[in-house]
Amino acid sequence: MKIKAVIFDIGQTLVYYPIPLNWSKLYRPAFESIAEKHKLNITENEYTHIGEVLAKYNTRINPREIEVSSNTIFNEILSGTNISLEYLDVIKKDFYSFFRNDIQIYKDAAETLQEIKSRNILIGTLSDVAYGMDNSYALEDIKPLLKYIDIPFTSNDAGYRKPSGKGLEILSDKMNVLTSEMVFVGDEKKDIECAINAGTISVLINRDNEEKKYGQNYAIRELKELVTIIG
């Protein structure tokens, strides 16, 4: 069957993030940085509250398939502190920025997307955002690649998180292709499960030496290998 669309996960697939997948140990440093920047007085009890709310929405600790907005999360955080809700947007921005330092787009990402695009194959993304991270931040990380991407899409847009196949199903409708005519490329088990749940061809990008068997149709070490798969 001819491949008509390729969908990419973002983190650790198109973009390298040097931070751990579980941010829990960095909650306090992130908010200490925010407090220092804005001269806020956050008490120990408030730091505990902040950590508890963030842990509640940490999908590495508490997986969920229904997405939750950033405003919901940060309203809950600030409501348990002395910080005015007027700071909500500023604190969201600084919190997300704390975790987005030193990111790097993988060196073969642009050339791979360009080659796929030259074959008249549609390109999209499907990424689970962290803590409801707004698309204005999440998609900023792939800004140099956006010229190749027909539909930049995240769990914010879908309303669902992986391994639910709903996001891929929505993308297939938007692209007017069958899910079976799509390839989904990701680096985690949930990416492969998402593809399987949607009836999409799955490609695991595995840059480690460790063998990973998640039920994927294909496994690659570098993005440029994808070109040979789509034919």
Regions found by a protein language model. Give the residues of each.
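N-terminal helical cap/lid subdomain that shapes the substrate entry/recognition surface
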Residues: 2-106
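Asp-based, Mg2+/Mn2+-dependent phosphohydrolase catalytic module
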Residues: 1-6, 17-18, 36, 41-45, ...
